[in-house]
UniProtKB/Swiss-Prot annotation:
Family: Belongs to the ARV1 family.
Keyword annotations of the record: Endoplasmic reticulum, Lipid metabolism, Lipid transport, Membrane, Sphingolipid metabolism, Transmembrane, Transmembrane helix, Transport
Tissue: Restricted to tissues in which cells are actively dividing or expanding. Mostly expressed in roots and flowers, and, to a lower extent, in stems and leaves.
Biological role: Mediator of sterol homeostasis involved in sterol uptake, trafficking and distribution into membranes. Also regulates the sphingolipid metabolism.
Name by which UniProt lists this protein: Protein ARV 1
Length: 245
């Protein structure tokens, strides 16, 4: 994601510069040489608009975030990657604790230290399996072997849906919310992969689905009851919804 790697958010064509700055607060957005449209209109957008478009899975905003928003001249990409990995694992540990919290037997039978060790081992093992399987699937289905760090950075950035789990610190939600967050995480990862590889959406979904499925299966080795809790909560929520309708 060097400076020369800026992309037009509309067509994905490489552009040399996104804007010309005449004075502080006075800029002119550059046009793409391929589609003749403004290369990146998100430069002048508020962060809330960018966040909303990310939730809506718009390819334009994914190109903006993955290619144009990070300036390698001022940001250490390697440090950013490690920070994202730490945040990702931390939120994953919280997700695991939320699911275990609904399992009363596990919550009361395990000591805090033992529970922490179990959660940490489970999260690290599941995510190691996710990264390995994702790399293998990407190489096999998309023939992408030269941009592993860039692609993994994009996957961690597109996992922003995990921050919605923090809302469960304040408000009480059914455990099925975690299931919906996982689905949105899968679709967001697929969109980011499509934008970065310019492959078909079907192949990108297949890669992410394989990686997430293997991650889930490895996670079940350490806590097989979590899946039953999640599915049970989802079925309970759906039955309640249909009764209202």
């Amino acid at each position: 994601m060097a400076a020369s790697e800026h992309r037009c958010v509309g067509c994905g064509f490489r552009v040399k510069s996104l804007f010309i700055q005449y004075s502080p607060g006075n800029i002119r957005l550059m046009k793409c040489g391929n589609c003749k449209e403004v290369a990146d209109e998100y430069i002048e957008c508020e962060r809330m608009i960018i966040f909303i478009d990310l939730i809506l899975h718009r390819p334009k905003v994914y190109r903006h975030v993955l290619y144009n928003a990070i300036n390698p001249a001022t940001v250490n990409i390697q440090h950013l990657l490690w920070k994202l990995v730490f945040a990702y694992l931390l939120l994953d540990c919280y997700r695991s604790l939320l699911l275990r919290k609904s399992d009363e037997e596990s919550s009361f039978s395990d000591s805090p230290v033992l529970l922490s060790i179990k959660v940490l081992i489970g999260v690290l093992s599941a995510n190691a399996a996710f990264i390995i399987s994702f790399a293998i699937a990407t190489k096999g289905l998309l023939n992408e072997v030269s941009r592993r760090r860039e692609i993994m950075l994009g996957i961690f950035i597109s996992s922003y849906f995990k921050i919605f789990l923090l809302a469960m610190l304040v408000w009480e939600f059914p455990m099925s919310v975690i299931f919906f967050v996982d689905i949105l995480l899968l679709t967001s990862n697929s969109m980011a992969l499509k934008v970065m590889t310019e492959s078909t959406m079907t192949r990108c979904i297949a890669v992410c689905l394989i990686a997430h499925l293997i991650r889930f299966l490895v996670g079940q080795i350490f806590e097989p009851t979590i899946f039953l809790i999640q599915i049970g909560s989802l079925l309970q929520y759906m039955s309640y919804f249909f009764r209202i309708v």
